A protein has these predicted regions:
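RNA pseudouridine synthases
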Residues: 1-239
Length: 239
């Protein structure tokens, strides 16, 4: 598997992750497991010297779900990593995704609260803000479920207390599927996947949230926007 480098300077790298490739290893994984971080480290070994809260994740600034493809930012220095963490906390690190959905499914999955927002498809290009807290759900807590501010206390207690917002708009047709563009700053595991499924538009290939079967998950991180961690110049990198 080859590394697709999209941007490089002395402080950061931006790479395009293939679908079904883990971004980083788990703490318990062997060193031989193939991950995006491992591929990057072959060409840029210094990224392993950058260690945040999880030392085994190197300089990876943000993760994509294994099934998701697209842009990942990786710091080459400890200083750049610390600066990018501060940028994320200030909600200045924006990620943009494109998702495809062929099937409208208004029936909620178990554990989902009633959907309180507009349907992004019927808004025809108007931005719809879908917000929630999240709780882990199901066997081995592999899935997540949105939680609203007025949800029962026993559900609220299972969240981190952070409100997550996905801005979604319908952006046309691709083949037989509808395309939705999604933007967010702070993110939670499966956030885009869950928010779209909640709205009635599960992503193609997302069997976990009742999307139709497809070769890969039709979710691609197509752009990142943030101030450069050293120069502070605005950056927009897009594929």
């Amino acid at each position: 598997m080859q590394l697709e480098l999209v941007y490089e300077d002395h402080d950061i790298l931006v790479v395009n992750k293939q679908a079904n490739l883990p971004t980083v290893p788990l703490k318990t994984d062997s060193q031989d497991k193939l991950t995006l971080l491992g591929l990057v480290a072959r060409a840029f070994p210094e990224v392993l010297d950058v260690q945040g809260a999880n030392t085994w994740e190197g300089g990876v600034v943000h993760r994509l779900d294994t099934a998701t493809s697209g842009l990942v930012v990786i710091a080459r220095t400890k200083e750049a990593y610390a600066s990018l963490q501060a940028i994320q906390k200030a909600d200045l690190f924006i990620k943009e995704y494109q998702a495809l959905s062929r099937s409208y499914k208004p029936t909620l999955l178990p554990g989902f609260p009633p959907y309180p927002y507009e349907d992004p498809f019927f808004c025809k290009g108007k931005e719809v803000s879908i917000g929630s807290l999240f709780r882990r759900y199901g066997d081995h807590r592999k899935e997540v479920r949105p939680v609203l501010a007025d949800s029962p206390r026993h559900l609220l207690d299972k969240t981190t207390g952070t409100w997550y917002l996905t801005k979604v708009w319908y952006s046309g047709e691709v083949g037989e599927s509808h395309q939705f563009t999604c933007r967010l700053s702070s993110g939670f595991r499966h956030q885009v996947r869950t928010h779209l499924a909640w709205s009635g538009w599960p992503i193609d290939g997302d069997i976990m949230y009742e999307g139709i079967e497809a070769e890969n998950l039709a979710l691609n991180a197509v752009a990142v926007e943030f101030p450069h961690p050293v120069t502070t110049n605005p950056m927009e990198i897009r594929i």
